[in-house]
Amino acid sequence: MSDTQDNAPASAQGVDQKAAAGCPVAHDSVTAHGSESESPAIDSPTPHSGGRPRTNRDWWPNQLDLSVLSTNSAKVNPLGEDFAYAKEFAKLDVEALKRDIVEVLTTSQDWWPADFGHYGGLMIRLSWHAAGTYRIDDGRGGAGDGGQRFAPLNSWPDNVNLDKARRLLWPVKQKYGQKISWADLLVLAGNVALESMGFKTFGFGFGREDVWEPEEIFWGSEDTWVGDERYVSEKEFVAGVGATEMGLIYVNPEGPRGNADPAAAAHFIRETFRRMAMDDEETVALIAGGHTFGKTHGAGIADDHVGPEPEAAPLEAQGLGWMSSYASGAGADAISSGLEVTWTDRPTQWSNRFFEILFAYEWELTTSPGGAKQWVAKDAEAIIPDAYDAAKKHKPTMLTTDLSLRVDPAYERISRRFLENPDEFALAFAKAWYKLLHRDMGPVSRFLGPWVPEPQLWQDPVPAVDHALVGDADIAALKAKVLQSGLTTAQLVSTAWASAASFRHTDRRGGANGARVRLEPQRGWEVNQPEQLATVLTTLEGIQREFNAAGGTKISLADLIVLAGSAAVEKAARDAGFEVTVPFHPGRTDATQEQTDVESFQVLEPRADGFRNYLRPGEKAQPEVLLVDRAYMLNLTAPEMTVLIGGLRALEANVGGSRHGVLTDRPGVLTNDFFTNLLALGTRWKASESTEHVYEIRDLATDTVKWTASAVDLIFGSNSQLRALAEVYASEDAREKFVTDFVAAWTKVMELDRFDLA
C-alpha cells in the first residue's frame, strides 16, 4: 500500500551489509595523521559534526553505543511512572470513539479536502504505513508505539502527506486524551475507515502504548531518500531491512529502481512482504484490498512545487510538511507520490472491483501528470469517477505493482481465485489486515477492548491455565526436588535462561511462557545446547509428572523450568554467604507443537548471546555490539546487562562449557569475582593468536595465562561507561548489592513475557 515512492554503526543493526567495510567497533581511535595536538607525537581524532556542537560520537564514531539501553526512559514520559494505559483505556467509550472517527472521515476540511468526500483511503494508508514498517528479522518497526509521529518516519517520502491525516485526527485525540494512545488511534482510524465503507473487519485490539522519542532503527545505509544502495544484485537486497529503497514501506510502486516491469516488481513484493511475515495469499489480499479504496496523488511535478518534509519544514509550518505551491496545493491539486491512480469506480465502497478491473483490460504504460510511470487500460471507456468533479470520468489506471498480481504466475492464481470468490477474498483481506495491524503486539493477553478475536497461530498462542497453581509450600518442595536431582547449577541456570531469553521486546515474541524451548525449532538451536537441554528437560519432566500425579495443585513445565533456574540461583547465592529468595509467580502454561509455527519461530534464533558467551560460527559482527542488541531485546538497562554478565559468568552459563570469562576459582557460586578479576591490577590482556574474539589475561610478573575471555567480557573493562558500572560491582562493599541486583535482573528476564503480572 503505497502513495509514493554510515558507515559501520556501533550498533548491531546494519552490520551485515557493512562487514566488508571492517570492524563495526574500532578498538583504536580514528585519527588524523599530521594534525596539531598538545602532544605532536599523538594523533588527534578527526571529528565529523557538520557544523553542530561536537559530541563523543563525532570524535569516536565507532564507540560502542549504549544509548539504546536508556531510550524512552521514565524521564521523557510526561505521564509519569504511575500512569497505566490499561486503566485509562477502561474509562473509554469505544463506540463513541468510533462514531467520532467516522465523523472525521466524512467531514471534508477546506485546508485538506477529502477525496470523493471521504478520508477513508487516506486513513487506510495512514494505518498501513504505521504498521507496515514491521520486519520479522529483529521485530523492529510496526505500529505498536506510535513511532510514525516522529522522525524519520514522519518525513519518509512514502509517508508524504500522512501528516495531514494525523492532524485530521487531532481533535479526536484531544477529546479523549490519555484514554486512547496515538499508537492505537493511528491504526484504529484505518480499521474504522474500512468498516465505514462497508467492509467487515476481522477484529481489533487496543493496547499499544505511546513512546515519547523515536526508537533508533537501522533503516538502511543510504544517505538519500529512495536510495537503493541495499541492492546486492538485480534480484537481491541486503538482509535486515524491510523495504527495497530508503524511505519506502515496501517497494517502489513504479517498479524496481523505477523500472516499470511488473514481473520484476513481483519478485521484490514477495520478498518485502515475506520480511513482514506475509505469505503470497496475504500479500495479494492486502494489496487488492487496500487498493479497492481511494487514490494516489500526482497532479503536478513535485520537484517544482513541493516543499520540505515535516522535519525540515520551517517553524511556522508547525509540524506539517510537503506544502505545495501547485495551484491550491490540495484536493484535486495534491501532489504526494506523483502517481495519479484511482483503482476502482467505487473508491469509497468495499467491492471486488479491483480484480474485475485488473483482469478486464489490457494495460499500456503511460506517465502521470506528476511524471511517474503508471498504466492505463487500453481501449477503455472512462468509468472512474473524479475525486472532486462529479461531471468528470477517467480511464482505469493501475500501478506497476498492481499488475504484478496478474503477471506473476503464483499471484495470478490467487488473484483469479479471489476474482471468482469475492467472499473468500473478503475474509482473506480481513485476516491479513488484522495481522498487519497487530503483528508486533505479541500475545492476545496484551490486547484490550471488546473487539479482540480468537488467538491466531501467528500470535504464538499458549493454553489458558486449567489447574490450581502451586503455593509457597509446593514451591519449596519442588525446589528441594530440583536441587536433589543431580542437575548442576550451570545446567539449571542455562536452561532457564534459554527458555526466557528468547524474548524480543520489539515484538513481544518468545519468552518462557509456553515452554517452547522443548519444541522445534528451539530445542535444536546450537545456542541452547540440545544434548544438555534434553537431559535437563527429561529430569524436570520427571519431577513434574511425579508432582502433578499427587493431585491438588499442578505445575507446568514452563513454570518448573523457571523455578528450577531460580532454585539454582538461590543455592549459588547461599554458597556465597547470602540468603535470597528469587521471586516466582506461577501461571505459565505449556504450548504444543501444533500451536508453534516452526518457520515463524526460526527468526528468533540468536546470532549471538553474549550472556552465554555464544557467537554463531561465521558471524562477522562484533560480539560486544551484538551483546548490546541482545540486552535491548531483553529490555535491559546498562546496569542490568552488566550485573547479569557478571553473575552468569560466575554460574558457568556459557554455551558448551566454555571457560572464557569465568574469572573465578569458585565457579557455581554467585560472587562478584568476574568484576574484581577483570579490573585487577598486575595483569595484562592479550589477543589470542589462535582463536578469534578470544583474549588471554596474563600475569605481568610471570606472563602466565590466568584466565581467558571473550570480547564481550573485555568490553566491561575497556568501554569507559561499562567500566564505571563494573567498578561498582568490583568494590569491597558491593558483594551483597551484586547478589541483590543480579536476582532482580534475573527475575526481570524470567518474567519478560508475563504480561498478566503488569
Swiss-Prot record:
GO molecular function: catalase activity; heme binding; metal ion binding
Linked residues for Tryptophyl-tyrosyl-methioninium (Tyr-Met) (with W-128): Y250-M276
Protein keywords: Heme, Hydrogen peroxide, Iron, Metal-binding, Oxidoreductase, Peroxidase
Database matches in InterPro entries: Catalase_peroxidase (IPR000763), Haem_peroxidase (IPR002016), Haem_peroxidase_sf (IPR010255), Peroxidases_AS (IPR019794), Peroxidases_heam-ligand_BS (IPR019793)
GO terms of biological process kind: cellular response to hydrogen peroxide; hydrogen peroxide catabolic process
Cofactor: heme b
EC category name: oxidoreductase
Cross-link entry Tryptophyl-tyrosyl-methioninium (Trp-Tyr) (with M-276), positions: W128-Y250
Gene Ontology CC: one annotated term: cytosol
Co-factor binding details: Binds 1 heme b (iron(II)-protoporphyrin IX) group per dimer.
Site (Transition state stabilizer): R125
Skewed-composition ranges (Polar residues): 1-10
E.C. number(s) listed in UniProt: 1.11.1.21
Domain of life: Bacteria
Sites where the protein binds heme b: H291
Catalytic reactions of this protein: H2O2 + AH2 = A + 2 H2O; 2 H2O2 = O2 + 2 H2O
UniProt region (Disordered), positions on chain: 1-59
Stretches that traverse the bilayer: none
SUPFAM superfamilies: Heme-dependent peroxidases (SSF48113)
UniProt keyword annotation of Metal-binding present: yes
Family of the protein in this entry: Belongs to the peroxidase family. Peroxidase/catalase subfamily.
Subunit structure: Homodimer or homotetramer.
Function: Bifunctional enzyme with both catalase and broad-spectrum peroxidase activity.
Protein name: Catalase-peroxidase
Taxonomic source organism: Salinispora arenicola (strain CNS-205)
Gene (UniProt): katG
